[in-house]
Each structure stands twice: as structure tokens, then as C-alpha cells.
A protein has these predicted regions:
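Structural signal for hydrophobic packing residues in well-ordered secondary-structure cores
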Residues: 22, 26, 219, 223, ...
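Short Gly/Pro-enriched turn/cap motifs at secondary-structure boundaries
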Residues: 203-207, 234-237, 283-287
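C-terminal active-site/capping subdomain that shapes the small-molecule cofactor and substrate pocket
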Residues: 247-302
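Oxyanion-binding "anion nests"
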Residues: 209-231, 235-239, 243-245
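Predominant activation on well-ordered alpha-helical scaffold segments within soluble catalytic domains
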Residues: 19, 157-161, 212-216, 260, ...
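Short, glycine- and charge-enriched coil/turn segments that flank and shape catalytic ligand pockets
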Residues: 135-139, 221-227, 251-258
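Short acidic/glycine-rich loop or secondary-structure boundary segments that cap or lie
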Residues: 155-156, 183-187, 238-242, 254-256
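N-terminal Rossmann-like NAD(P) cofactor-binding subdomain of oxidoreductases
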Residues: 1-205, 224, 286, 298-301
Length: 302
């Protein structure tokens, strides 16, 4: 018997991507899609490239429509998942793709999201370095409530965590500049597409981006000491993908061999993370529509 799945908020980009992934999963059957703005429309009307499940009809996002599934994906706007989560049975696997349950600190959540903190769920980044040489994967087994990591947070965390674990860089001088696709703003975002297609521009500059506390929370689990991050996202004329340029000051005596050894020891057996050869750097088109992450390494000798 297949696992019965529902997507709450399936009319957005995240919901559409979940439907695409589930369509190729041999053991899961998507049976319900909710979307209050699209009730009565078909999933295929918003996702023309979708073949399987294209005839599923959106229903209202209610408790009655979400009960009775084995797994429920919450693809709702930030701060909207907490209430919906209370509707669902304890034995149902619930994965929140929003930010409601990512942060452990209520103070940080309320500061960046301007909303009460609903608590934290098990963080869903299997490759994340935690205490000692352990990874978050060990904590995910058997969990019924999982917080899916943020996109920018994933790109920064995976790039910097091995360096911090091995004490190779100054943890108080981390800088991340991310070129991000327009889909990151969401389907209903008030983004004027004309200037986006003609230029690139920074947004949420000056330490106000909501992924900052999530990244710091992640990196603190690996770092030897406090972590300080400067993060600037730049919207560029591509639809999907992130190219993260992460820089950090090397500590004395650290060379490229030590850096490569750090990444290889952490990610060498990870199926979805590729450490690129020397002088080779990531290209978003190489990982588009995949689960893969590419990591390139360079030392500024100037």
C-alpha cells in the first residue's frame, strides 16, 4: 500500500515543486492538494509541465481536508503553518517547508518574523554537522515533525560548517553573498519582473534577512566559538537556483589541502554533495531540478 500524501498550500512554487517530486516517487501517492486562492482549479493549471497529478483539484485548506493522510507537507507562507499543524494527528508525518519551526530561539524568531514562536521541530538537514562528529541525520530517524531548512540557509551552512568544525577560519568574519533566482520570492510576491529580467539588485540588506538566525543557529553547532555572519542576497535574472559566494578569513597555517580534507571528511560519502576539483566552480544549471549541491574551493592569495 502506498503512502497517502497531502500538500497544504500547493498553489505556490514550493507546493508545485513538491508535486513534481512526488510524481516520481514510487511509494507515495499524492491524494490531496489545498490552496485557498485556487479552489476548484486543477494542479495542472498552475503547473503545465506536470503530467501525473495534473487533474487533482484544489480544495480549501481546512482540517477536514487534511485529516486521514500518512504524510502532510505544509507549503504555506511563513507564520501560517503553526495553526495548521495543530489540526493534524500525532502519528502523521508532517514536514513544514516554511520557517515556523526552524528556529530554536523564540527571541530570534519574534525579532525576524514579527510573530509569536510556535516552538521548534527536528531540523531537516541530514548533512548538518552537530555535536562532535555527528550529523543531523541521526536525529531525524523516527521523527513525526520536521522543519525543512531554508534555501539560502542550506547554501551557506553546507559551505561553511566543515571549515568551522575543523577550526580553519575565523568564525567572527564570515561573509556570504548569494545570487538567487526570482522563484525564491514566491508565486504571489510583489516583484516587478521587468527590472529583474534586465538587472540584478540586492535586497534585505544590512542584517535583516530572515535566514540569518537560521544560518547562525546551524553554524554554531559546528563552530569553535561565536559565529558572526554578513549575508547579502542579490536577485538575479534566473528563475531558480542559488549561487552562494562564501568567504572567510583563514587562520594561520591553513592551506587548500587542509580545506579540501575538511570537506572530504564531512561530505565524502554524501550522495547529494559534490566537491569540485581545484579551479572548478559551481554552475546553477548543473544542479537545476536536482537535489545536488556543488562546492568549489579557492584561496585568495592576494
Amino acid at each position: 500500500m502506498k503512502i497517502r500524501a497531502a500538500i497544504a498550500g500547493a498553489s505556490g512554487y514550493v507546493g508545485g515543486e513538491l508535486a513534481r517530486l512526488l510524481a516520481n516517487h514510487p511509494n507515495i501517492e499524492l491524494v490531496t492538494v489545498t490552496g485557498n486562492s485556487s479552489v476548484g482549479e486543477t494542479l495542472g493549471s498552475l503547473n503545465p509541465a506536470l503530467d501525473k497529478y495534473s487533474d487533482l483539484v484544489f480544495v480549501e485548506n481546512t482540517k477536514e481536508n487534511l485529516l486521514g493522510h500518512d504524510v502532510v507537507f505544509l507549503a504555506l507562507p511563513h507564520t501560517k503553518s503553526a495553526e495548521v499543524a495543530t489540526w493534524l494527528e500525532d502519528d502523521v508525518l508532517v514536514l513544514d517547508c516554511g520557517a515556523d519551526f526552524r528556529l530554536e530561539s523564540a527571541e530570534e524568531f519574534e525579532k525576524f518574523y514579527k510573530s509569536p514562536h510556535a516552538g521548534s521541530w527536528t531540523y531537516g538537514m541530514p548533512e548538518l554537522l552537530i555535536e562532535g562528529n555527528s550529523k543531523q541525520r541521526e536525529k531525524l530517524s523516527g521523527q513525526k515533525r520536521i522543519a525543512v531548512p531554508g534555501c539560502n540557509a542550506t547554501a551557506i551552512t553546507l559551505a561553511l560548517a566543515p571549515l568551522l568544525r575543523d577550526g580553519l577560519v575565523d568564525p567572527t568574519d564570515l561573509v556570504s553573498t548569494l545570487s538567487v533566482g526570482t522563484s525564491g520570492a514566491g508565486r504571489n510576491a510583489e516583484v516587478n519582473q521587468e527590472p529583474v529580467l534586465a538587472s540584478a539588485f540586492a535586497y534585505q540588506v544590512g542584517g535583516i534577512h530572515r535566514h540569518i538566525p537560521e544560518v547562525q543557529q546551524n553554524l554554531q553547532k559546528s563552530a569553535k566559538g561565536q559565529v558572526s555572519l554578513t549575508f547579502t542576497p542579490v536577485l538575479v535574472p534566473m528563475f531558480r537556483g542559488i549561487l552562494a559566494v562564501n568567504t572567510a578569513k583563514l587562520l594561520p597555517g591553513v592551506d587548500e589541502t587542509a580545506i579540501r580534507n575538511a570537506f572530504t571528511s564531512v561530505y565524502g560519502t554524501e550522495s547529494f554533495i559534490e566537491i569540485l576539483p581545484s579551479a572548478t566552480f559551481p554552475n546553477t544549471s548543473d544542479v537545476e531540478f536536482t537535489n545536488k549541491v556543488q562546492i568549489g574551493i579557492a584561496i585568495d592569495e592576494a
